[in-house]
Curated annotation (Swiss-Prot):
Record's protein name: Ribulose bisphosphate carboxylase
InterPro entries: RuBisCO (IPR033966), RuBisCo_large_chain_AS (IPR020878), RuBisCO_lsu_C (IPR000685), RuBisCO_lsu_C_sf (IPR036376), RuBisCO_lsu_fd_N (IPR017443), RuBisCO_lsu_N_sf (IPR036422), RuBisCO_lsuII (IPR020871)
Protein residues bound to substrate: 111, 168, 288, 321, 368
Cofactor detail note: Binds 1 Mg(2+) ion per subunit.
Gene Ontology terms describing biological process: reductive pentose-phosphate cycle
Pfam families (alphabetical): RuBisCO_large (PF00016), RuBisCO_large_N (PF02788)
Active-site residues per Swiss-Prot or TrEMBL entry: 166, 287
Length: 459
């Protein structure tokens, strides 16, 4: 059934919809299946996403028609479809009237993902009007709070030098804590890898107790504050809270040095909101393991990594992994930097929409996946700044001289970039950085041709 006479209004102007402030706008790349018209399929998509179905129903009244989602722009050649969703469609909490991301997803990326007349449809951007934006929690903490703990400038404190303890599974509590101590002697921040939790060979309570002690010892030995991101991911709300409370109690006076990591993609919006509301004084570390199933450019359905990041800021993530923008081992490209800008800027341009965040606190980009000291300068050149959390697993513990030296090499790489000094030149007077060239020779050859002669040349 062609529903374009009801669910399509191509005379609507995007600027007018934004000025009206009553619609969430979504931009998709959509292709109908063979034999279906573009506008007809787009209208069915909007109907299925809001007030309609595949037939007219007798219970529809004038009010119902007033909250229809409307297709307002199409470009069949480029497969672009834009839909305006009235804000009244989205579910709100009965306890406080706040917005819920699960409702946003249910409507905009819900049943429409399985429609028989749609070959594929993927959301590439969305716009949130002020009246709806104000109903989301947004972050309570971000990198500025980490800088404060570290004793840095809270406006431009620079890269937080971090790692992921490797191997990701198989370490028992003491070796795990020993690895933490080793890295902290040179670095700032350690995160649990996403599967690390309460395995039988590494009970959480024993591991956390030893890690808290390792942090105290490292702080005493270096005179510097240290940070730890502890995984509290769980299916059950009460389990998450129990883990969080135990961790804070165990770290004691260093509780403000602790972030909580939640696997936000696999556990969903409920887990992120649980952590955000139950622990508002902790940095909420959004890990996105599994997201590539829908966000990868190879996937033609779902939504992009840009959309995931934007949703994370709405929900209140203090930081979210944003990949390495083509400079590490994970899928990505240099243009992905717009993802970081959308997280950090007061107003930013997306692929289709400009979003004004109305003072909502920024979310911190977390950079990980195949990074080491040799890859950092190019990454920072592309991004234009270094106010990120950077976590290198192999880039730290793959250093020939161990985790402490690996951490120092990462810090020295950042120092060189901040000073505008060529990395090979800087390495001549910084042993750990020099050894990073020897630790990762394939990267050294790729990014710094002739480094061997230059590194050992007399200054």
């Amino acid at each position: 059934m062609d529903q374009s006479n009801r669910y399509a209004r191509l005379d609507l102007q995007e600027a007018d919809l934004i000025a009206g402030g009553r619609h969430v706008l979504c931009a998709y790349v959509m292709k109908p299946k063979a034999g279906y018209g573009y506008l007809e399929t787009a209208a069915h998509f909007a109907a299925e996403s809001s007030t309609g179905t595949n037939v007219e129903v007798s219970t529809t009244d004038d009010f119902t028609r007033g909250v229809d989602a409307l297709v307002y722009e199409i470009d069949p050649e480029k497969e672009i479809m834009k839909i305006a969703y009235p804000v009244e469609l989205f579910d709100r909490n009965i306890i406080d009237g706040r917005a819920m991301l699960c409702s946003f997803l249910t409507l905009t990326i819900g049943n429409n993902q399985g429609m028989g007349d749609v070959e594929y449809a993927k959301m590439h951007d969305f716009y949130v009007p002020p009246c709806y934006l104000r109903l989301f929690d947004g972050p309570s903490m971000n990198i500025a709070d980490m800088w404060r703990v570290l004793g840095r400038d809270v406006r431009n404190g620079g890269m937080v030098v971090g790692t992921i303890i490797k191997p990701k599974l198989g370490l028992r509590p003491k070796p795990f804590a020993d690895a933490c101590h080793e890295f902290w002697l040179g670095g700032d921040f350690i995160k649990n890898d996403e599967p690390q939790g309460n395995q039988t060979f590494a009970p959480l309570k024993e591991t956390i107790r030893l890690v808290a002690d390792a942090m105290k010892r490292a702080q005493d030995e270096t005179g510097e504050a240290k940070l730890f991101s502890a995984n509290i991911t769980a299916d059950d709300h009460y389990e998450m809270v129990a883990r969080g409370e135990y961790i804070l109690e165990t770290f004691g006076e260093n509780a403000d040095h602790v972030a909580f990591l939640v696997d936000g993609y696999v556990t969903g919006p409920a887990a992120i909101t649980t952590a955000r509301r139950q622990f508002p004084r902790q940095f909420l570390h959004y890990h996105r393991a599994g997201h590539g199933a829908v966000t990868s450019p190879q996937s033609m359905r779902g939504y992009t990594a840009f959309v995931l990041s934007k949703m994370a800021r709405l929900q209140g993530a203090s930081g979210i992994h944003t990949g390495t923008m083509g400079y590490g081992k994970m899928e990505g490209e240099a243009a992905d930097k717009i993802m970081a800008y959308m997280l950090t800027d007061e107003a930013a341009e997306g692929p289709f929409y400009r979003q004004d965040w109305l003072g909502l606190k920024a979310t911190t980009p977390i950079i990980s996946g195949g990074m080491n000291a040799l890859r950092l300068p190019g990454f920072f050149d592309n991004l234009g700044h270094s106010n990120v959390i950077q976590t290198s697993g192999g880039g730290a513990f793959g250093h020939l001289d161990g985790g402490t030296a690996g951490a120092k090499s990462l810090r020295q790489s950042h120092e060189a970039w901040m000073a505008g000094v060529d990395l090979v030149t800087y390495a001549r007077e910084h042993r750990e950085l020099a050894r990073a060239f020897e630790s990762f020779p394939a990267d050294a050859d790729k990014f710094y041709p002739g480094w061997r002669d230059r590194l050992h040349r007399a200054a």
